[in-house]
Amino acid sequence: MNEVKPINLVGVTACPSGVAHTYMAAESLETAAKAAGCDVHVETQGQIGIENQLSTAAIKAADVVILTNDIGIKNEDRFKGKLVLRVSSGDLIGKSPIIVKKLMAKLAEV
Amino acid sequence: MEIVTKDIINLDLKTQDKNDAIRQLGQLLNKAGRLNNLEGYIQNVIKRETLTTTGIGFGIAIPHGKTDAVKDISVAIARLHEPIDWASLDGGKVDLIFQLAVPESSKGDEHLRLLSALSRNLIHEDFRNKIRTSQTAQEVIDLISQSLTKALEV
């Protein structure tokens, strides 16, 4: 088994009303990823509009893309060819530390 | 108008179930002159609740209504006398409610940034703990404004 190493993550979060879950999910993912030593960028698509838009470089460098599946994500074609994980914003809010750990373990197997 | 004021905070709300809690907080918002239509707002919040639960875990629920029944963007806060069921994502009971009221037409509103910053803060345990141990409504407001100021500076 290979060594589990920090990975590069990007994510996009959105939710039906776009006022709360979007931001909680983003914060939770960022906090968990940083705690695990990973590089992380999370774009929010809420009522305010798009914030922290992912750069082309960040997407290119990402080992995995995490998208919330509560509602559609805008400009999803940016992630063509990337490894994409779809989870609910609720799962990101509650389980980001576990999700990040599992992704790190999974990528170490490759 | 500020998004949270003392008159929409109840640090010892007595309630048995979530619909009653939503109604009581709706009444607080209405009394503070922040709604156009109390029933319309309550129905909107309860309808939102049926889409997916707003019990986000950590003992917190964030019911919200986005409707023209809301006049001013607001967050009513309640600490519950006894924790209640909220079909939470982590299965736990809820003892802290942040009930949002957002006008339908609030696109681009600066206040939405405050709500997003508050939502982000709720992810952090130390922030939740401080709200749980606050002695007065003013203390809660101070905590929130401090953290929001910090969040908006970054």
Residue ranges, per PLM feature:
Chain B
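Cytosolic covalent-transfer regions centered on His/Cys nucleophiles
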Residues: M1-V154
